[in-house]
Amino acid sequence: GRPLQAFYRDNAEVRGLAELYPDTLEGLASQGHLRQDHPLVGLSPPASFHMDTFEGESRYIHYLRLAALALNEPYQKMVEEAAGKGEHKPCNIKGDARMRNKALAADDHRYEAKPRPAHNIDILRCCVTFEDVASMRKGIEGLVALARKGCGGVGRVKNGFALSDAEAAKSFHYRSWMMNMVVDFGQTFGEMLSKEKAAGLLDKYLRAPPENPDEPWGRWRRDAQAAAEALRSGEMSRRPAVMVCEVQVLLRPYLEARR
């Protein structure tokens, strides 16, 4: 990590990125941690998803992932357009096994309020890499503006450029800037799911064998079907398509150092 340590130490522009902490969406600080079921987001589980057993949370995982499937392509395009000169790298939605493991892990979400999968605020995610500090600052301005469209806003920022030398040493002086944003997609879920491609993605998900090898086919199909029915319900069709998404912003030297 010594080359990255020197790069940060010797470059005032890079160190200046430590100041980038845009204001978060009003109402978040007073209403607890950022979650997908936060009132400002609105992805609460349907009443039919009973939380007295893990079955309800299992269905909720499918519910969130199906919503993310429908929104992933629009999200990636929005970020690519907002990021200016940044090199955008899209990602697949977060995996089922990862979300289940986090919900049950004692050092993760096990003791959080149900539905615990609501803590996954990176189901939709991507990365944008910039060649220099000036273009990175401009790109972050564009991403913050994207976040603040409609009823959305900045949810949380993790600024690795603000870490002390000792803290940065724990990750070999790798630094990045990460933002979770409440994204308003400007349409209802009904409008999003009426599109042929989004509807096809959901149908493909329901027909496919379990993505998670630890999930029996029968349980996977049962819970996925229940989630799809809830997502396609009349109530959900009128709800604005809003979701917490994540974007990681990098400077090229940090990306190259990881290869």
Spans of model-derived segments:
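Charge-rich, low-complexity segments
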Residues: 1-120, 134-137, 259
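Long beta-strand-rich cores associated with HINT superfamily self-processing modules
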Residues: 110-259
